[in-house]
Amino acid sequence: MAPTKAAILAFQDDIKERFLRGEIRHPIHLCDPGQLDHLLPIFEDIQPQDWLFTSYRGIFHWLLKGVPPERLLKFIVEHGTMGFCDKERRIVSSAIGGGCLPIAVGGAMGLKRQGGKERVWV
């Protein structure tokens, strides 16, 4: 079951507060809360077998793709928001703005050549 809008925003607020208290000592990149309204209908179409390529500003994406909040929190506390990837959920992130685009194109081409039914989302 997908997390609610309220739960996602509360998670991000918690990250912000932890950062301000000095509990997170790595760079964090928060999302504009208004983006969530646009993402919710898109993520209704994203299936578990689909691949998601995103950036360092992917808190909403990661939660909507099914990453357990406690796992994501642990990663962010230890490493910040850059570089989170999850092979099991087929999530690839890049710390470089736009850096995942060529990787996503290659992944999509590979899936198409193999006749796969998975989709690639960027």
Residue ranges and their predicted role:
Residues 1:
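Conserved two-metal-ion catalytic palm core of "right-hand" nucleic acid polymerases
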